[in-house]
Amino acid sequence: TALVGEDNAEAAFEKLSSMVTGDVYGEDAVKAYANGGGAYFCGFTNSLATLTFDGETSTISGTDKDGNVLFSHAYHYIGMEPVRGLYEFESDDADSGEFTYFFLAPDTSAETYHIEFRYGSDAEALSQYDVGEYAYWLASGISTDCDQTMIDNCIELFCTENLAG
C-alpha cells in the first residue's frame, strides 16, 4: 500500500494480477483477447519445471517436475530481439524441438531477483508478442536457491515497476 495508498490497494492488486495471471497463450490467447485486454501467461511450457544455465559450456538444460531431463543443449548467441531487448540464442543441436531457441531478458537474479525468457522452435514467432503460437507468453523464473528476502525483493520490484508514477 505504500506505493498506491490504502484506498487504491485493491485496484492495484487487480491491475498487477491481471498482467501476469493468464492461463492461455498462443492462438488460444489471441482468440480470447480479440476484443481487448489480455494477461500474459508467465509459466513454463512443454512440461518444463526447472532450467539450468551453465555459462562455462554455454549449455541450457531443463527437467520436468520429477527431475527427468527434457533437454540439454549447447547454445550460441544469434542477436538481439528488438521489441523487448531479449538476447537470442540458438541450439547447436539441429533436433532441439521446442527448445531450439531461447530469448533471454537482461534480468539477473542479482539485480532483478528473477529472469524472464521465451523458448521455442520458431525464432520469428518468438519475436511476436500478440500473435502466433507464442502470443501472450513470457516465462518468468526465480532461482531454486532463493530465500525469503529474494522473493520479497522480487515482489517489491514488480510492484514498483508497474505501479510507480
Would you name each region that the model predicts?
Residues T1-T57, D95-T108:
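Short, solvent-exposed loop/hinge segments that bridge or flank secondary-structure elements
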Residues C42-G165:
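Calycin-type beta-barrel ligand-binding domains and close structural analogs
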